[in-house]
Structures are given as C-alpha cells and as structure tokens.
Curated annotation (Swiss-Prot):
GO molecular function, a single term: bis(5'-nucleosyl)-tetraphosphatase (symmetrical) activity
Keyword Glycoprotein: no
Family annotation (PANTHER family): CYTOCHROME C5, PTHR40942
Gene symbol of the encoding locus: apaH
InterPro entries in alphabetical order: ApaH, Calcineurin-like_PHP_ApaH, Metallo-depent_PP-like
EC number: 3.6.1.41
Organism: Stutzerimonas stutzeri (strain A1501)
Family: Belongs to the Ap4A hydrolase family.
Catalyzed reactions per annotation: P(1),P(4)-bis(5'-adenosyl) tetraphosphate + H2O = 2 ADP + 2 H(+)
Function text: Hydrolyzes diadenosine 5',5'''-P1,P4-tetraphosphate to yield ADP.
Name of the protein described by the UniProt record: Bis(5'-nucleosyl)-tetraphosphatase, symmetrical
C-alpha cells in the first residue's frame, strides 16, 4: 500500500487521473489524500467530486474554501459568482448525495502513524496540533448537524475577527476557525490574520509572515501537507511542510506526492487539462 497526497483539484480531474495512472494507483491497494478545494474554476467540478466520493475509504479529503462555498450555494445561502463552475453539481441528479457527502468531510486529517497532518490552508502558529484538531471539530460539528448548518453557512463569510480570543463564541468563533484552516496565508505570530495579501511568500505585509515560517509555531514537530496557496509554486522552504497546490487551474501544474518516499510527480496543465 502506498499513500499519495495531491493539492487543489478545483474541478481539474484529467490531470489527477493522469498522475494516478503514472504511479499505477489502485484504490484496492493505495490511498489518496486530497488537500481540499475539490471543485470550482476548473472544467470538471462535478466529475471531480464524484470521482473522490466514489473512491470511498481509499480517499481522505479535507475541506477547502471553495468546497465550503459550494455548500453555501447549494443551501441558498450564497449566490454563484461569475468565476464559479458549480452549476453542473447543482443540476446533477445525485446533487443531494454529493452535498451530503461533502459536509461530512473534515477540516484537518491527522495520521498518527506518520505523524502527518493535512489541512487546506494551514494551522495558525499559536495552536498545537491537539488544539487545532479540537477547533476543527467545532466546525465539523456545525457542518454535520442539521440544526447548526444553515446558521454557520450564513455567517461563514467575512474577514473578522482577525485574531483568536478564547472568549470568542458562536458564529464569529467558527468563522475565524474556518478562515485559519481554509483561507490563511499570512499572519502574525499570535495568529492575527491578513486575508488580503495573496501573492508569494515574499509579499508579506509589514509585521506579517507566512503562517508556516514563524519560529514560535507549535506544530514544528509535525509533518504538514497543505494546498490553497498556488502562488508559492510548491516552495515553502520549511522542513516538514509541503505546499502541494501548484496552480493547475491557473495553467501551471498539478502535484502528487508519495508520502512514503517523498517523491513528487507533476502534470503540467493548460485550461485545467494535461498540457
């Protein structure tokens, strides 16, 4: 058995199938980790979502911001944006099954044997892995509880609060947890977020740094897999931290990592398909 991890699909299924064929991936034998943002902007959001769902226990995915956006759109909380490519999912005969499957997924996955965690955007530097898993569980409960789902989705959007306070409660608390795990790039050592800056690691606003580069980061002893930040181009210059979103949907590449050997496989892409 081999375990692989891949960055954001964003509705680009063909590059993934190309990579899986290259490594002779077998669902009966191997496992695929996906770092979130399965859907949106690419040409095959519906097909990508079905593909991952149908892998069943051979796939482990965490939720990204685009996946959460799909949940909000599907529940009539948020409108579609011009760049969204979600309509095929909303019109699909298995829409209800797909949406229900998506809301059961986690924000963080941790493999104790590998001492490896996967998250879409990152883990704020002031939180230990144990604390991050507890915070993620709060949002996961809101997503999976019918009574909590709509209030959470309705209050999910927004950049405030930007700094963690243990006294936060209700939707603002869940919004900040969600922003940490699905939208974060730059923050201060105390976890104060800047969600406006979206370029490479060297474009940090004054007083901020990439979340993974803070010397005080409490997850330095954990191997971390993340996606989301395509502008890093797979480079983060931190031991044990692996940026796997290499911008397939933007015409760059999709990257598949062998978690056992560390080997990286790339599929160059154009218009969401193998170049």
């Amino acid at each position: 058995m081999t375990t692989y991890a891949v960055g954001d699909l964003q509705g680009c299924l063909e590059p993934l199938t190309c990579l899986l064929e290259r490594v002779d991936f077998s669902p009966s034998r191997d496992c695929l980790w996906l770092a979130g943002d399965l859907v949106n902007r690419g040409p095959q959001s519906l097909e990508a979502l079905r593909f991952v769902r149908d892998l069943e226990s051979s796939a482990i995915t965490v939720l990204g911001n685009h996946d959460l956006h799909l949940l909000a759109v599907a529940h009539n909380i948020e409108r579609m944006r011009k760049s969204d490519t979600l309509q095929a999912i909303l019109d699909a005969p298995d829409r209800a099954d797909l949406i229900d499957w998506l809301r059961q997924q986690k924000l963080i996955h941790y493999d104790a044997e590998r001492h490896t965690a996967m998250v879409h955007a990152g883990i704020p530097p002031q939180w230990s892995l144990e604390k991050a898993l507890r915070r993620a569980a709060e949002v996961e409960q809101a997503l999976q509880d019918d009574a909590l789902l709509l209030p959470f989705l309705d209050g999910m959007y927004g950049n405030q609060p930007a700094k963690w306070n243990k006294e936060l409660h209700g939707v603002p608390r869940l919004r900040l947890i969600t922003n940490y795990f699905t939208r974060m790039r730059f923050c201060k050592a105390d976890g104060t977020l800047d969600l406006d800056a979206k370029e490479g690691a060297d474009s940090a606003p004054a007083g901020y740094a990439p979340w993974f580069s803070h010397a005080s980061r409490k997850t330095r002893n954990v191997k971390l897999i993340f996606g989301h930040w395509a502008a890093l181009e797979g480079q983060c210059d931190e031991p044990n931290v692996f940026a796997l979103d290499t911008g397939c949907v933007w015409g760059n590449a999709m990257t598949l990592m062998n978690l056992d050997s560390g080997e990286m496989h790339r599929c160059e892409c154009e218009h969401g398909k193998p170049a």
